[in-house]
């Protein structure tokens, strides 16, 4: 810019010097002309007027140059101000970007803390005493986040307003100085060098304008990015609100599942204790049986007896008992399932009847009053009749069974979650009648007498008394289930009751009873 100023000064000086030379040359020519042509005063007047016109043109050029210099100084100062303001805005945007990063880091830290707190709360069984104490910390965190977001939004709005005001100032400045200033480069006064210098100045001004527009566009893009990031932050805050609202429901569900599992564990413990008690009783009964057999074997030395344990193994009896226990358990499961299905069918029927009654009532209410009384009487007569009652839970109709020490396989099967999990996590459980263990000692005496070897009254008419059978007929089952059960039972091997067996009278009664039990086990297999 100082080079351009020097060129303009040189142009003005050359113009002034040329005008002075022309004036001096005109004066000399006028003297010569006056010497040659004396008395011609009109030519002098014309020359004076031309000199005055030239001087006025020079003054106009000087005023234009001064005006241009003033505009140039104003442009330089405005460019400096704009560059300083743009740098300040860039610094502010950088600080805002750093603040946004810090806010995002805080949000990530809050997410991690919320996750850890949620996991800890799920692990804990007890809930807080009131909802206000539970949601106080979460509410304070959300309030602080919302305050920070509002402050950042206000800062962005202020920056946007300042940028808009500066853009308006630049527009007014351009309209004021550039539209009014239109220099004619084709005039004869300016030379080629001056026109080139003015073109360079215009190019520089255009470059400054382009740079300012680019910077303004960059600021606008940064503002758009900032608004997008704020929208993203708002979405994250909403997601956090939803997550915080869902946390108590998840904790309640977890506590309910924990309580259900605790109930199931307690039921399992009770069943295990009952099975242990049964095992202890069975071991005692086994010891009593062994002592009785030993007492029976200890007879006088005059009589020679055959030891039944040399050829016959007492485990055959236990195998028979195990198989019968399995059959009893299968029948019990089938009876329970059928009772449940009948119960569900009856409930559905009752629900449909209720829905039909409500629908009929609505239809009767829509009828005119003359017909309504007749239909209401019929409906009341039908409503007085009772609906079909629900089927009660099937109770165990057979006698309680003793588990022997050799039933390890059955104990492993019964300890599975399908058998021992009496309280399911859904809250549904089996009926107490079908799951309670009857530990009555008086009812077990009759069964213990059955487990002992059969006593033969007469050796001439010998009949073998078999073990207790599985209860086949249950009065609470429907006809279809009974037919299916009989079809399934026909496929299974049967025990023959009261079958006469020929025995050797030479053998003692204990050995004969063991042989009878072995024969019974063979028939069962």
Swiss-Prot record:
Gene of this entry: ASF2
Function recorded in the entry: Derepression of silent mating type loci when overexpressed.
Domain of life assignment: Eukaryota
Biased segments, Basic and acidic residues type: 479-494
Species for this entry: Saccharomyces cerevisiae (strain ATCC 204508 / S288c) (Baker's yeast)
Gene Ontology process terms (BP): silent mating-type cassette heterochromatin formation
Chain intervals for the UniProt region annotation (Disordered): 467-525
GO CC terms, sorted: chromosome, telomeric region; nucleus
Miscellaneous field: Present with 1910 molecules/cell in log phase SD medium.
Protein name, as recorded: Anti-silencing protein 2
């Amino acid at each position: 810019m100082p080079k351009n100023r020097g060129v303009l000064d040189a142009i003005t000086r050359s113009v002034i010097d040329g005008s002075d030379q022309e004036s001096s040359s005109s004066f000399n020519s006028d003297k010569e002309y006056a010497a040659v042509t004396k008395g011609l005063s009109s030519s002098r007047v014309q020359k004076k007027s031309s000199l005055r016109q030239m001087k006025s043109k020079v003054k106009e050029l000087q005023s234009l140059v001064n005006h241009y210099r003033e505009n140039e100084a104003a442009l330089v100062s405005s460019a400096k101000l704009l560059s300083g303001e743009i740098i300040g805005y860039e610094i502010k945007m950088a600080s805002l970007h750093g603040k946004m990063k810090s806010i995002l880091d805080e949000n990530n830290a809050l997410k991690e803390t919320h996750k850890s707190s949620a996991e800890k709360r799920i692990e804990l069984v007890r809930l807080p005493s009131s909802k206000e104490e539970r949601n106080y910390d979460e509410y304070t965190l959300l309030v602080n986040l919302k305050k920070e977001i509002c402050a950042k939004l206000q800062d962005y709005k202020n920056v946007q307003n300042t940028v808009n005001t500066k853009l308006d100032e630049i527009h007014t400045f351009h309209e004021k100085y550039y539209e009014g200033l239109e220099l004619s480069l084709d005039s004869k006064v300016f030379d080629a060098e001056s026109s080139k210098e003015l073109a360079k100045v215009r190019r520089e001004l255009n470059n400054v304008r382009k740079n300012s527009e680019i910077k303004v566009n960059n600021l606008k893009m940064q503002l758009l990015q900032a608004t997008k990031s704020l929208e993203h932050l708002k979405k994250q805050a909403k997601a956090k609100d939803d997550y915080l609202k869902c946390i108590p429901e998840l904790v309640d569900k977890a506590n309910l599942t924990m309580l259900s599992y605790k109930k199931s564990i307690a039921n399992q413990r009770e069943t295990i204790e009952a099975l242990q008690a049964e095992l202890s009783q069975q071991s005692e009964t086994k010891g009593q049986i062994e002592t009785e057999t030993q007492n029976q074997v200890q007879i006088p030395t005059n009589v020679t007896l055959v030891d039944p344990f040399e050829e016959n193994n007492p485990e055959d009896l236990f195998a028979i008992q195990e198989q019968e226990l399995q059959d009893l358990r299968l029948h019990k499961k089938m009876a329970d399932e059928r009772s449940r299905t009948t119960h569900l069918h009856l409930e559905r029927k009752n629900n449909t009847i209720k829905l039909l009654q409500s629908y009929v009532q609505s239809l009767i209410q829509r009828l005119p009053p003359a017909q309504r009384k007749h239909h209401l009487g019929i409906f009341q007569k039908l409503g007085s009749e009772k609906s079909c009652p629900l089927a009660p839970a099937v109770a165990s109709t057979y006698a309680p069974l003793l588990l022997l020490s050799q039933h390890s396989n059955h104990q492993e099967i019964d300890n599975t979650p399908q058998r021992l999990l009496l309280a399911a996590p859904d809250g549904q459980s089996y009926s107490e009648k079908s799951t309670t263990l009857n530990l009555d000692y008086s009812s077990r005496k009759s069964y213990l007498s059955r487990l002992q070897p059969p006593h033969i009254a007469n050796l001439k008419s010998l009949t073998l008394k078999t073990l207790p059978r599985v209860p086949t007929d249950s009065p609470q089952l429907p006809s279809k289930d009974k037919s299916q059960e009989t079809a399934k039972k026909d496929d299974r091997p049967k025990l023959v009751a009261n079958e006469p067996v020929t025995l050797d009278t030479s053998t003692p009664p204990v050995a004969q009873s063991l042989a009878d039990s072995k024969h019974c086990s063979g028939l069962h297999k």
